[in-house]
Amino acid sequence: MKIALDAMGGDHGPAPCIEGAVQAAKELDVDVVLVGDETTLKQECARLGATDPRISIRHAPQVVEMHESPAAVARKKRDSSIWIATELVKSGEAGAVVSPGNTGASMVSAFFVLGLTKGVERPAIATSLPTLTGEAIMLDVGANVDCTAKHLEQFGLMGNEYGKHLFRKPNPRVGLLSIGEEDSKGNEVTKEAFKLLKASQLNFIGNVEGRDVYSGTADVVVCDGFIGNVALKISEGVADTIKKLLLKEISGSWLGRLAYPLIAGPLLNLKRRIDYAEFGGAPLLGVNGITMICHGRSSAKAIKNAIRRAKGMAEGRVHELIQRDIEESLATPPAEPSA
């Protein structure tokens, strides 16, 4: 398996990408193509001692910066690292593309180069969240700020297939994020989406509230990209604040400092559970190929784990299974409303 890595788009330059690629090649038995400015990448590889023969370089003279409009990619940056990396997936040279760069640029490249899965109206970014029972998927978390009920239904179908792959569960529990558990709670879009999801073949458990997302009540949580992105950013902020408060309390008293050796292990485990680097990246579901989107500040560990997930999805042909489910849903007549 070969993975195309946009090595130029991250906040910290190509170094974390190169280090993550080396770790992935060593631990995951995967070939990685570093896509970016050839001279820069060769210099960085030499500086970091990255000589693994499974790491190769594909020249891309342009870079999409974080502040640039994603629309500019299709108009004037088709020689950018993210565009060329995505083309490697389209041609079949790579099984997936991973990028810590401009999220919008990744989406635009996937849309124009790979194309939407047949029948999919909108793609969705699916992130992984830690729960009391393990892990859950939430989608969409930023690809679409405005959604229809049909879009949310399709997010449920796509998330269900990703959940089958990720959790090795034949029938993941799918919930709809809302302001109450009752069927009648929510706005008009979510109430209509509730009806569509309930009539589908999914293991739909109904509405889930924000407080239930991390309890493990649902394996897949469906929402629009505006709500999902806000919820994700709040969660990241809360996790970071709790971590800082804990350290402040521990270091602020002699009793805390005395007890630290006894609680260091559990604290380290907690940090690992909520660390985004453990999950690596979030796939863009609903396109004809595997696109993995990472944090701009991704570490080498995060890049390695994003490659791990991208490799697994490519080997599992998750995008093809999503297409099958979408086609089946479109071929199935809507259920008659109950009396």
Model feature map: region roles:
Residues A4-A15, A74, A143-E153, I293-A300:
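Short, glycine-rich nucleotide/cofactor-binding loops
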Residues A50-A94:
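Phosphate/nucleotide-donor binding subsite
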Residues F111-I125, P130-M138, T217-V221, G225-P337:
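Glycine-rich phosphate/nucleotide-binding loop
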Residues A15-M66:
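N-terminal glycine-rich anion-binding loop in soluble enzyme alpha/beta folds
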Residues A15-P16, L28-V33, T39-K42, V145-G210, ...:
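Glycine-rich phosphate/diphosphate-binding loop of Rossmann-like nucleotide-binding domains
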Residues D6, V35-G36, R58, S99-G101, ...:
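Short beta-strand segments
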Residues G13-C17, R78-G92, A96-A110, E121-A126, ...:
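Short glycine/serine/threonine-rich phosphate/pyrophosphate-binding segments
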